[in-house]
């Protein structure tokens, strides 16, 4: 997600495969900022997000693959796993527990230790209510 919601929720070490609307850069000189700006060079400034047809940041991709390879448990939630290349990264998981939480079936359900066919947001709300008690 490009909306920074994970960071606002307190998550650390978020890998932004598709970039972030919180960062902007100049296409001409590469100057960056955490807000939209007019570049001194007169170049076009755009948000640091990956649009359809553009390549993902390879450093972020490599780190995502590394983290997946190292994980003992991987929870995949709220995704149909049909958008590539991100859906392909599950092939790197070698851990013990693959958990898929999605309201529809996915192509990886047969490989998962646990599949919960439910709405992720509703499920997390119930989990949080249990934890708060």
Residue ranges: model-predicted function:
Residues 2-133:
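Conserved catalytic alpha/beta core of Sir2/sirtuin-type deacylases, generalized to analogous enzyme cores
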């Amino acid at each position: 997600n490009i909306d920074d919601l994970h960071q606002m929720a307190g998550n650390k070490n978020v890998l932004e495969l598709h970039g972030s609307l919180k960062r902007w850069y100049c296409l001409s000189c590469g100057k960056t900022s955490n807000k939209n700006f007019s570049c001194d060079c007169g170049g076009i400034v755009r948000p640091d997000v990956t649009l359809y047809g553009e390549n993902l940041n390879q450093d972020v991709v490599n780190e995502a693959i590394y983290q997946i390879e190292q994980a003992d448990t991987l929870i995949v939630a709220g995704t149909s796993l049909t958008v590539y290349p991100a859906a392909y990264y599950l092939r790197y998981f070698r851990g013990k527990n693959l958990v898929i939480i999605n309201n529809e079936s996915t192509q990886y359900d047969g490989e998962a230790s646990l599949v919960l066919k439910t709405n992720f947001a509703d499920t997390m709300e119930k989990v949080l209510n249990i934890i708060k008690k």
